A protein has these predicted regions:
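Conserved double-stranded beta-helix
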Residues: 25-34, 56-129, 172
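Catalytic core of Fe(II)/2-oxoglutarate
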Residues: 105, 121-211
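Fe(II)/2-oxoglutarate oxygenase catalytic core
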Residues: 1-37, 44-83, 141-144, 175-185, ...
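Active-site-adjacent structural patch at catalytic or cofactor/ligand-binding sites
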Residues: 20, 113-115, 149-150
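Residue-level signal for pocket-adjacent positions within structured domains
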Residues: 1, 21, 33, 37, ...
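Conserved small/polar residues in nucleotide/adenosyl-binding loops
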Residues: 227-233
Length: 234
């Protein structure tokens, strides 16, 4: 329910119309995570390094949000909406695979991210990540050592009334015989934030509470989650 800790292979399906994703992951966030979810027995200093990575990512996040505020000429609206932001970092392992695949099965299916922006570190140089342009054409994302990919998320698309469009992306089965690792940092507003049109154009979306939207999207991705109004309030 809290989208934290270890997620087994096949637990998530970001494209509900396709077979389950071929990955396992570990999620942690910038708030206090329950101690029993940390892998202390396997990696003793993992929690310290994970929390340091959150601090670095959050600093970069504020710099990027400030740039968006400037572009949109909306003061400090986005920075202010993330003063107590609820961010989740995910370490993803796409195992090497030699067997047969189901029709349309990918390492991770076509999807957009749910929050404001996502910072993505590609950990090793194994191809597969693709992004879709506005014309529907897919393009491979090259590996850049120490580089960060910045994806627009669904909430920023709603905030900007489609001025910025959420990035559709996927990980295809190129080099599926090799393990692939990545680390996305998902940026979400302070829980309780109402996301509404910041532009002067007619509204394309109804205002929505940020965590309500997040929980709704997560419920679609995880076969084991059932969306309820109670879950959105936790």
């Amino acid at each position: 329910e809290n989208n934290l800790g270890y997620s087994v292979m096949g637990a998530e399906n970001v494209d509900p119309t396709a077979p389950k994703d071929m990955k396992e992951s570990f999620n942690y966030n910038n708030l206090r995570m329950p101690d029993e979810l940390w892998p202390h027995g396997w990696v003793p200093d993992f929690q310290y390094k994970a929390e340091e990575s959150i601090r670095i990512a959050d600093t970069l996040t504020y710099n990027i949000l400030n740039k968006f505020d400037t572009i949109l000429d909306c003061g400090t609206t986005l920075v202010d909406a993330h003063q107590q932001m609820y961010n989740t970092t995910r370490i993803i392992h796409y195992p090497a695979y030699e067997g047969s695949l189901e029709n349309r099965q990918m390492r991770i299916g076509e999807h957009s991210d749910y929050g404001t922006i996502t910072l993505l570190w590609q950990i090793n140089d194994v191809p597969g990540l693709e992004v879709q342009d506005l014309g529907g054409v897919w393009h491979p994302v090259p590996f850049e050592e120490d580089g960060v990919v910045v994806n627009i998320g669904d909430l920023l698309q709603r905030w900007t009334n489609d001025y910025f469009v959420s990035t559709k992306h996927r990980v295809v089965n190129t080099h599926i015989h090799m393990p692939r690792y990545s680390m996305p940092h998902f940026v979400d507003p302070t829980p309780g934030t109402i996301v509404k049109n910041l532009t002067n154009e007619p509204d394309k979306y109804e205002p929505i509470e940020s965590k309500e939207y997040l929980m709704w999207r997560l419920a679609q991705s995880y076969y084991c989650l059932l969306y309820t109004s109670d879950a959105a309030d936790e």
